[in-house]
Structure formats: C-alpha cells, structure tokens
C-alpha cells in the first residue's frame, strides 16, 4: 500500500512537471494552439452552411463533434509519447528506479490528460463565439459533457498505451495515423453520420470516436438536433456502454502489455534503436 501511494505521488508530481513544461516551451505551446486554430478556421467557414432542410448549421454540429474527436486523439498522444520515450531510454530509466514504472505511467496519464483538457478549452471557449445555436446554459449540459469526457479518456488513453508498446520507434508511429484519419472520416465528425451508407455507420459505431462525438453533441446541442442522429436519439445508455466496454478492454490489456514491454527493455535494445535512428539520419 505504501509503495502504491509513493508511486501515485511521484506520478502526479511528474505529470504536473511535464504539463508545466509543455506550456512554457515555445514548440509545445505552438502545437497546443495550432490544431484548435485550424479547427476554429474550419468552423468559421462552416458557420452559415445549413445541413439539408434540418435548419441546423454545419458549424454548430461540427464544434461538439470536433471536441469529441480531440478527446479520442488523446489515444494517439499517449501512444506517441510512450514510443518516443521508449526509444530515447526514458522508459528504461523509469524501470530501473523503485516504483518507477507505475509512477511513470501515472505521470504520463496526468500530462496527456491535462494537455488534452487544455486543448479542449482552447477550442471550446472561442468556438462558442464563432458558431451559434449551442445549448450550454443548463447544468445538465455540463454534467453530460463531464461524464462523456471522463469516460472517453478512460476508454482511449489505455488503448493509446497499448499502441505505444507495439511500435518500437517514433518513425513507425506514422502507421497509426492513416486508420485514425479513416475513423474520423466515417464517424460523423464534420458531417452527420446518417448521410453515410448503413455499413459505414455500423463500422463507425464499433469505435470510440463516433460515441465521443455523439456524447459531446448531446451535451452541447439542443434536443431537436437529435433528429439527424441514428435512431433520432442521443443514445446515452449506448454511449456509456460502448465507451465503458472500451475502457474495460483497455484497463485489462494495457497493464499486461506494458509489463511485457518493460521486461524487454534493456540498455542494449535502447542502443540498438538509437543506432538504427542514426543510420536513417545518415
């Protein structure tokens, strides 16, 4: 019990330090701002475009969907961070210290989740003024936003940790981008999913990105907007069920995969990866 509390305190402290560093480093600050600015630009041009005869504007529909997409992208951020720090030896150093691996993973969750929340705030706050038609006045909206976001992070961050243990180099991380972009394209983020073929709708509903987008739309859009969703409903129970299933899967698989990855780490494996990276640069 004492070892666990030490790991939690060390991980929390490590995560806060990493988070503070990410907002004091010019390159990291730019990366935090770049994506929200790009999305706000897209929303600006969509703000007056209507979806069919529904009377709803694409900009209004897209803002909560993009928030859900960004929450799901925490999975990619976690995967990239683990892969990069595995390659540069950070993971090996954590393994060599008492309670190092649990503390390292807790710290990584804190820093990635904290950065994700900051990015969502950077997008949501100005987005409210860019697009109209949002229903954010009541406490119910913010309560739904909170549980969808928290459950979504629990569902996606462990999967990101699993993916980070699979790839052996930062360069190979590029392999994950194409399927993720494909999932975004079919998950109703920038255009309602009901406009897509039925078989694509079924594929999208198997993954967290669609459900995070749906949950965010249910929190921020008026009730009438559910008319353009599948079954003309926000389907809160289904959202909780699918995200919960992904969370259980990730929490069961991630510790096993990460322990196996940590056992394989050694000074020679880190040196070999560095040598391969230098050969690519040369």
Q: What function would you assign to each model-found segment?
A:
Residues 101, 106-177, 236-240, 244, ...:
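Alpha-helical transmembrane segments and their short interhelical loops
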Residues 2, 6-14, 191-228, 237:
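Short hydrophobic, aromatic-rich alpha-helical segments embedded in or entering the lipid bilayer
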Residues 26-27, 60, 102, 170-171, ...:
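Residues that define the loop-to-transmembrane-helix transition and helix capping
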Residues 21, 94-96, 164-167:
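Helix-capping/transition residues at the boundaries of transmembrane alpha-helices
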Residues 3-4, 10, 17-88, 114-116, ...:
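Transmembrane helix-boundary elements of multi-pass transport/secretion proteins
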Residues 42-50, 164-210:
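Transmembrane helix segments
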Residues 81-113:
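Helix-loop-helix units of permease transmembrane domains in multi-pass membrane transporters
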Residues 41-45, 124, 128, 161, ...:
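Transmembrane alpha-helix boundary and packing residues in multipass membrane permease domains
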């Amino acid at each position: 019990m004492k070892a666990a509390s030490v790991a939690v305190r060390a991980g929390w402290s490590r995560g806060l330090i990493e988070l503070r560093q990410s907002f004091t480093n010019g390159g990291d600050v730019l990366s935090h701002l770049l994506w929200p600015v790009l999305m706000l630009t897209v929303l600006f041009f969509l703000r007056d475009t209507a979806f069919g005869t529904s009377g709803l504007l694409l900009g209004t529909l897209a803002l909560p969907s993009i928030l859900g997409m960004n929450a799901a992208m925490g999975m990619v951020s976690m995967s990239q961070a683990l892969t990069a720090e595995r390659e540069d030896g950070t993971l090996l150093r954590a393994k060599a210290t008492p309670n190092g691996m649990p503390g390292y993973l807790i710290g990584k969750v804190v820093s990635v989740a904290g950065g994700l929340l900051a990015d969502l705030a950077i997008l949501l706050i100005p987005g409210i003024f860019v697009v109209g038609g949002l229903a954010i006045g009541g406490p119910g909206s913010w309560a739904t936003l909170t549980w969808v976001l928290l459950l979504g992070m629990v569902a996606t961050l462990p999967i990101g940790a699993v993916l980070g243990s699979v790839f052996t180099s930062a360069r190979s991380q590029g392999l994950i981008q194409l399927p993720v972009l494909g999932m975004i394209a079919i998950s109703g983020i920038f255009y309602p999913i009901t406009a897509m073929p039925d078989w694509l709708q079924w594929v999208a509903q198997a993954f967290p990105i669609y459900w995070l987008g749906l949950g965010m739309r249910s929190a921020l859009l008026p009730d009438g907007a559910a008319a353009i969703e599948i079954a003309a409903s926000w389907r809160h129970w289904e959202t909780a069920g699918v995200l919960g299933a992904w969370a259980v899967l990730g929490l069961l698989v991630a510790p096993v995969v990460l322990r196996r990855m940590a056992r394989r780490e050694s000074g020679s494996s880190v040196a070999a990866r560095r040598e391969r990276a230098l050969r690519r640069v040369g």
